[in-house]
Amino acid sequence: MEENEVKKIKQLFRKGVALALAAVTTLSVLPAATVSAASQRATITFAYCYDGNGNTIRYQQTASHNGVTFSHAGEARTRIYADGDNAYCIEPGISLHTGNTLEKDASVVWNNLGKAKQDAVNLALLYGAQGSMGSLSGTEDEKVLATQMVIWEIVTGCRNATAPYAQTDAKFYNSLCVGGANSGIAAAYNQIISGMVSHGTIPSFASGSTDSAPQELKWNGKQYVLKLTDSNGVLSKFNFTSSNSDVKVSTSGNTLTITSSKAIAGNVQLSATKKIPTVSSSAKLIAYGDPSLQDIVTGVENTAAVKAYLNVKIPYGHIQIVKTSEDGVVAGLKFQITGNGIDQTVTTGEDGTIKVKNLQPGTYQTCGTS
C-alpha cells in the first residue's frame, strides 16, 4: 500500500473515532438534562369523587367568578393530582387537563396572591385534607373537595385572608352544598373553617406576651390558690407548665387552678404551646404553574407555634406591731419574733411601730426583750 493511501486511511479512521466519541458524549449528556428538566414539572391527572354512599359528587349550581364559569349544574366533580399527589386549584374555571404538565415554583398567580392569602391557603391545607385528613369527617374525596372550596374562597377574596376569616361570598359553597346537598363536604368544610377561626385563640385569662401583669394567688388557710376560667373554651388545647416547681398547675374543664404551699419572691411565669395540626418539618407547600393553564398548589407546611403566657405572684405576709406606753416611751424598744423558722429581734421606731415583712403564713410569737 502506498504511503499516501495509508495516510488517507489513518485520517478517515481518526475522523470516524472523533465522530463516535462525539456521539457517545452527546448520548451521555442528554439523559441527565432530561431527568433534571422532568424533576421540575408535574404531570396532572384527575379522578371522579364519591360521597359516603358511593354516589358521584356533582355540582348543584352553574356559577362563575370574574366572568369565568367554574361549575355547571349536574357536572361530576373531580379532584386533581400532580404526579400522584393531592393538588388544589388556585385559578377556578381556568383550563387544565389530564396529561398537562406544570412547572414547579412557576406560578405567577401564587406569587401575586400576597403573604396574607398565601398564609391563609396554607392554614386551610393544614386544617384541611393535607394536615388533618384523619380528624375530618367524611370520605377522602369529601375532605379534599371541602379543602378545595375553602382555598377557592380565599384566593378569590370570597373569604377574608385574616382572622376570623369571614366569608364574603357564598358562590363556591353554594355551587356544591346549596340546600343541604353534599352534606359530607359541608361537614368537613365547617370543620376546616372552625379550625382556622380558632387557630390563634388562647385562653381568655392568658396573654400572647411574656410581660403581662401578674395575677395574685390568695391564701385560703392551707395554701395559696388562684382559679381562672377560660371563657374562650380552648383550655383543653393547652398544657400549662410553671417556671417554678413549687407552683403547681392543674386543669379541669375550662378552669385552670394554680397552687403553692409557700410564698415566692418575684413573679412566676406559666407558659403553654397550643396543640394544633402539624406535619413533617421537611414538608413544603409547592406552587406549580403555566401561563396558559390553571395553576395549582400541593403539600402543606407547619405554621408558627401558638403560645400563651400567664404571670402570677405569691406575696409574703407581714406583721405590724404598734407599741403604746403610759410613760410615752415607745421608741427603741426591742421585741423578739419567733415561729415558722423565724427568730428575729426587731426595734420599734419613733412612733412605736414595728413591721416585719416577707413572712410565710403561720403563727408567730412576739415578746419584749430587755
Residue ranges and their predicted role:
Residues 13, 26-35:
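C-terminal segment of classical bacterial N-terminal signal peptides
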Residues 38-198:
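Short, surface-exposed polybasic-aromatic patches that bind anionic ligands, especially phosphate groups
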Residues 159-315:
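Acidic/charged, solvent-exposed loop-and-adjacent secondary-structure segments enriched in E/D, K/R, S/T
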Residues 340-355:
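Short, acidic Ser/Thr/Gly-rich low-complexity loop/linker segments typical of extracellular
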